Curated annotation (Swiss-Prot):
Enzyme Commission number: 1.10.3.15, 1.10.3.4
Keywords noted in UniProt: Antibiotic biosynthesis, Copper, Metal-binding, Oxidoreductase
Protein's UniProt keywords contain Oxidoreductase: yes
Amino acids binding Cu(2+) A: 39, 58, 67
Function: Involved in the biosynthesis of the parasiticide antibiotic grixazone. Catalyzes the oxidation of 3-amino-4-hydroxybenzoate (3,4-AHBOA) to yield the corresponding quinone imine which is then non-enzymatically conjugated with the thiol group of N-acetylcysteine. The resultant compound is oxidized to its quinone imine enzymatically and is then dimerized non-enzymatically with another quinone imine oxidized by GriF to yield grixazone B. 3-amino-4-hydroxybenzaldehyde (3,4-AHBAL) can also be used as substrate to yield grixazone A.
Superkingdom assignment: Bacteria
Record's protein name: Grixazone synthase
Similarity section: Belongs to the tyrosinase family.
Enzyme class: oxidoreductase
Length: 306
C-alpha cells in the first residue's frame, strides 16, 4: 500500500495524536535513539574512514537519496506501532513563526525557555518524559558537517532557540529559484558546488551550503529550518528533535517537486563511479540495500498530498 504524506496543517487532530503516539512508543522501545545514533555516525570521522572516505548523508550528492531511505526506515518503524501513520511535512515557505500549529502543546511543543533554552511544553519536553540519551555538540571552530568532529553533549533535555541565529525561514521565492535549477549536482560534489553561475547544483542549494549572488546569506532552505529552530536542530544529533523529520520530509518533497518539474534531466548525479561520493549505483550505508537509482521514484513507497 502506498501511503500519502501530508502537510501537518491539513492533518486532523486524530492523525496528529497517532503520529505523536507512534513517535513516543518507538522512543520508549529504544528504536528512536538508534535513528539519532545513526545520523551522528554517518557524519563522524570514524564512519567516513570505514566507508573509504565516501560521504553519504551530507555535503554531497547522496544527501537526498540517503535521507529518503533514512525517512523510509523511520516511517516503517512508526507503522509497526500504527500502520495508519505517515510522516508529515513542514512547509516552512508559508508556515512561519512560533505561533504556527506546528509548535502546539499537543504536537511538537514550543520554543525553549529563556536562559538554558530547555523546551518545557508538549510531548517532547523533558518533564513530560522525552529524555535525550545520545547527543553531541561540535568540537573545534570548523563546521563539523565538513570535518566530522563532535564531542559529547551532556544535556538530557531538548533545546530550541527560535529565530536567534537567523531571523528568517525560507521564502517561496527562494524555493522556486532553487527548483528552477536544471542540474542535480556538479563537481566538486561538496559544499562549494554550484556557488557561481550557472549555479549547477540543485542539491547544494537545497541543502543550504551555497546561494545565488543576490541572496543575503548562506544557510537557506534545509539549513535555514535547522538554524531557525536552533538548539539541538543545529547539530548532527538533530533527530533528537522530532521536528527534524518534518523538515526532512519537506526536503524530500522538494526533491520530488524538482523531479516532476524536470522530467528529462538526470535526477541524480554522478551516474558513474566518482571518488569520495556515492554514484547512481552505490549501495547506501549503513544498510547497503538500496542505491540512489532504487530511490529515485518515491511513488513506489509513498506520495505527497500536493
Amino acid at each position: 500500500m502506498v501511503h500519502v504524506r501530508k502537510n501537518h496543517l491539513t492533518m486532523t487532530a486524530e492523525e496528529k495524536r497517532r503520529f505523536v503516539h507512534a513517535v513516543l512508543e518507538i522512543k520508549r522501545r529504544g528504536i528512536y535513539d538508534r535513528f539519532v545514533k545513526l545520523h551522528i555516525q554517518i557524519n563522524s570521522t570514524d564512519y567516513l574512514d570505514k566507508e573509504t572516505g565516501k560521504r553519504l548523508g551530507h555535503v554531497n550528492p547522496g544527501f537526498l537519496p540517503w535521507h529518503r531511505q533514512y525517512l523510509l526506515k523511520f516511517e516503517q518503524a512508526l507503522q509497526k506501532v500504527d500502520p495508519r501513520v505517515t510522516l508529515p511535512y513542514w512547509d516552512w515557505t508559508t508556515d512561519h513563526g512560533e505561533n504556527s500549529p506546528l509548535w502546539s502543546d499537543t504536537f511538537m511543543g514550543g520554543n525553549g525557555r529563556p536562559g538554558d533554552r530547555r523546551v518545557m511544553t508538549g510531548p517532547f519536553a523533558r518533564r513530560n518524559g522525552w529524555k535525550l540519551n545520545i547527543s553531541v555538540i561540535p568540537e573545534g571552530p570548523e563546521d563539523p558537517a565538513l570535518n566530522g568532529n563532535y564531542t559529547h553533549d551532556d544535556r538530557d533535555y531538548l533545546v530550541r532557540d527560535f529565530g536567534t541565529l537567523t531571523p528568517d525561514l525560507p521564502t517561496p521565492q527562494e524555493l522556486e529559484q532553487t527548483l528552477d535549477l536544471t542540474v542535480y549536482d556538479c563537481p566538486p560534489w561538496n559544499h562549494t558546488s554550484g556557488g557561481t553561475p550557472p549555479y549547477e547544483s540543485f542539491r547544494n542549494h537545497l541543502e543550504g551550503y551555497t546561494k545565488f549572488a543576490w541572496e543575503p546569506r548562506l544557510g537557506k532552505l534545509h539549513g535555514a529550518a535547522h538554524v531557525w529552530t536552533g538548539g539541538h536542530m543545529m547539530y548532527i544529533g538533530s533527530p533528537n528533535d522530532p521536528v527534524f523529520f518534518l523538515n526532512h520530509c519537506m526536503i524530500d518533497r522538494c526533491w520530488a517537486l524538482w523531479q516532476a518539474r524536470h522530467p528529462d534531466v538526470p535526477h541524480y548525479l554522478p551516474t558513474v563511479p566518482t571518488q569520495d561520493v556515492p554514484d547512481l549505483n552505490t549501495p547506501l550505508g549503513p544498510w547497503h540495500t538500496k542505491t540512489p537509482a532504487d530511490l529515485l521514484d518515491h511513488t513506489r513507497f509513498y506520495t505527497y498530498d500536493q
